[in-house]
């Protein structure tokens, strides 16, 4: 093994071990914060602080889950649980989950469906839901009020293609080659404290596990368009 490869392997093993060790204390802190917040005698200031603790613990818990997921992918210990998926149902469920969130933020979320029935997609439904969720979450986070986000699916040559399009801040050309790298954070206009640069990396890993691919392009008028290809 080359020195660089050895260093990367050591880093991956450390992240995996550290992530496992963080789960228990995080759970204890979160449980303690919930107990404290249930005290009816708490002052408004104390309630505010416990709410912050709860929020930050949940954020850290999400990071730990993402790190563990990537560690499992690295170790090839996370097999896909493929089933036959009804694409129409998946699209409708995804729309119903995110439309209220978009509406609350003043964003129009549109779902385009085909009049023709989609072929059955053989994939891991939980991972597919996670892939779409990451893209839509990103689209919401980087979209402006009164803008639009759209989700649709089409059938190409032996491929099912999901398209997520937003009219938000977009991604600079200089950042595009790196957006799927671990811990990469783009320019300040696309940097938020809730994100650690793992979401798109996770989508890439999960899509490639399905032998698919992702394409990124600019939305006409500004924003991003992601196309996710799954083999049929």
Specify the residue positions occupied by each region the protein language model found.
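Short helix-loop "hinge" at the ATP-lid/N-box region of the Bergerat-fold HATPase_c
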Residues: 139-140
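Conserved micro-motifs of the catalytic ATP-binding
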Residues: 75-80, 118-123
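A conserved beta-strand-to-alpha-helix junction within the catalytic ATP-binding
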Residues: 81-99
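Short conserved segments within the C-terminal catalytic ATPase subdomain
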Residues: 101-112
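Short conserved segment of the HATPase_c
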Residues: 171-183
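Short alpha-helical segment of the dimerization/phosphotransfer core of two-component systems
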Residues: 55-60
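Conserved glycine-rich
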Residues: 211-212
